[in-house]
């Protein structure tokens, strides 16, 4: 197994040896020397992306951001309209490792690095013997061939756009273990590719009615309204419906966002803080409810940031008849069998555990809602009561229908149970206690969460670790929402354990990147 990482100071000698092997002995670009080492003239400016097997350097790419680039020194005119491009100074793979798998892994590492560094364009002098291989990855020639004999090179440019259109991009696309956007079933993609329907036609109205009916069944509520937008829109719509004095339960980043929704809507409310990673302390909540009579309580069913699922039935039992329960169920719906019967408003979306494409916001409610001239039109829940209220996308509705057809709530629970047990058994520190663990997403507390997330992505597994609140808390999240399989999860766990061990060793050795 080849491990990919950014080179440290201890890798320098091996880099010089591989540079010599490739660009002196194999490609006669430089004169031989007794030491059989070649130090790149821009070595101190290079960032080296390397692959090692059993501690032996087998592949590398050197990235340089400083102008002028090598091609410019050779007289090639570069596009001056590009923002902060870079160049690949060296690209080398040992002959015995020149199979498509090694090169593809190296290229995936390159694309992860370029994205992290916000580099959209990179130049290379590609050897003519590998020009077809470069083209498969999206490199395009920009000038005539340079050099002579066995040392001929084609000036080429790779952009994120040409990479995404390349024949290899789908092969290298990582598996998503995200809470959104999620991996979708092939039938969902196929449904989304149908010809769009005008939003005022009878077929569109029927599609809208059918989908809202299925969502009523899923939520166990008599009414569901649908808007084109995100979960943020759904919660903004709900905030407009709140009146009187309320209580917001805040157990993390998304509880905090409910506070922001209510504050922006000018609502009156108190805040009840929940312990991070733990169930609701019912006695404390009951005490606050006893002290103040609230018109509504708003909480997240699944607090996505911590991976905690709150007990709605326990909260319901504490409320009197006049207190409305409002639920953000965006990361809960589709992860298990839940009834939201009796909840005044419930929000969810198409692009999370339901498994559809992002773009549909659902608001479930216990009773019909009339339009109000005091509410901005797009935030007026009453305008959505009869179905299609504004311009919408039939493709999103068709994709969501296909996602509901593919949704297996029992399998969702099995996958998450296996993942949680396996991760706990390997010694990782999970933020949520076992009794509070959500069935769709878990949060790992790790001192090198960002490095671990990068390592997983390089290996082809995209988990959540880049949001500001995750970086700030050193958290990494794995979600089983969407079309993940048990085989995918088993492979992810093996890679997770291996990369964690590698990072731990590197941290113990206090290794730092070469040329940081």
PLM regions and their residue ranges:
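Short amphipathic alpha-helix that is part of the acyltransferase structural core
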Residues: 1-38, 43, 48-58
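Conserved acyl-donor/pantetheine-binding loop and adjacent beta-alpha core of acyl/acetyltransferases
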Residues: 42-46, 50-52, 56-98, 152-153
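Acyl-donor binding region in acyl/amide transferases
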Residues: 74-151
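Active-site C-terminal subdomain of aminotransferase-like
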Residues: 183-184, 351-426
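Conserved beta-loop-alpha segment that forms the PLP phosphate-binding cup at the N-terminus of a helix
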Residues: 212-215, 221-247, 251, 255-260
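Active-site phosphate-binding strand-loop segment of PLP-dependent enzymes
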Residues: 279-330, 334
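Conserved PLP-binding catalytic core of the aspartate aminotransferase-like
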Residues: 429-459
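PLP-dependent enzyme catalytic core of the Aspartate aminotransferase-like
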Residues: 476-516
